[in-house]
Amino acid sequence: MSQTKKDQPKGNLAWWQLSLIGVGCTIGTGFFLGSSIAIVKSGFSVLLSFLIAGIGTYFVFEQLAKLSAKQPEKGSFCAYARKAFGKWAGFSNGWVYWTSEMLITGSQLTAISLFTKHWFPQVPLWVFASIYAVLGLLIIFTGLSVFEKTENVLAVIKTAAIFMFIVIAILALCGILSGGNHGIHVPNKTSEFFPYGAMGLWTGLIYAFYAFGGIEVMGLMAVHLKKPEEASKSGKLMLATLAIIYIISIGLALLLVPLHTFTEQDSPFITSLKGYNLEIILDIFNGIFIIAGFSTLVASLFAVTTLLCTMADDGDAPKCFTLKEGKKICWPALGLTFAGLVLSIILSLVLPKNIYEHMTTAAGLMLLYTWLFILFSSKKLTDPEGMGKTQIYLAMVLIAAAVSGTLFEKSSRPGFFVSIGFLVIIAIVTMIYQKKQGHKDRPASP
């Protein structure tokens, strides 16, 4: 079983370090690239989308932090689901998260490999994907300390890059930089702020939520805090920082060029600076995109490997994935993660582009389903009152709005149904698991 608060080893992580790790695990291709899709869908109202998504994410993390403070668990949200609703909830939650993260790692590998191919066009995509996959696994192999330091350093680099864009954008708006003959594009009417109406805001909301994906890793890391009750403080700092720099940077990008200039294929930061003769800066940003994608890739690998070991402890995964006493790494768990990575790379290269995109959309949605279960678990285990209960219900409404918005967009609708298909498969496996557990628990006939 998972460790209880009494026998939980004391952590050595300060709350601000968890905040920094959270930034490292969150700022990735979901923001640097995914925000362009949100802009295309929503226009200027994308700023409202990011504010809504930031608030919703904060409400979810606040509940996860309360659970972590009450009883730190290695399995985090999976352990809390098990406590709240039984073995089936822990089992299904774990495998929903594992499946979604492995699919997401495939898209992350593809994205950072494409960025690298910009500099080395002759090298096949799979070569870069393989190199980044091995590097990511090496960081996980070296242990928790190296993972923490890596995410801290990459978090600083990514945050500095966003601040660099903000400074450059302000200089451009002030006319200090040469080029960029588009003028400043400020929406003067409601119809200009909502160019695609309420439906545009609705369908773009899901991509704003994707930019905040990563709080689950903070939940898994919260057990290493010196004071688990400070998890809430680290989440507040991290999410407030992200929401502010996200909204300011995207707002500046929108002011620099006309809306029709943005495309789903290019980062809004590259699009907005293209006319300013800043080739070196654009190359620097290409490098930042690689760092950002690699950072979130490593976070995903850490999460799935750690969670797999914990699930094995709880009987929700084969016992061979249990971390042996005195060992720092579970080789079978790392091996399965490697196998999942290889499969993700193959799928991204072999499957038709639209089918693979539907699968990665489904993976992002499944991550939000995990967030919903965090809310359900908190409602049952913490018995919230007043503002706590209001936060839970508001977060549920906001997540439901983001998920349902995919049904009204032709490109994302198939991803919703693919996510439901994955849930059905995992539900069937869960029922088989429950049945087998029932047979094990049943006393033998005399």
From Swiss-Prot:
One cellular component (GO) term of this entry: plasma membrane
Cell compartments where the protein resides: Cell membrane
Cell membrane among keywords: yes
Keyword Membrane: yes
Coiled coil: none
A Pfam family: AA_permease
Superkingdom to which the source organism belongs: Bacteria
InterPro entries: AA-permease/SLC12A_dom (IPR004841)
Family (UniProt): Belongs to the amino acid-polyamine-organocation (APC) superfamily.
Protein's name in the database: Uncharacterized transporter YcgH
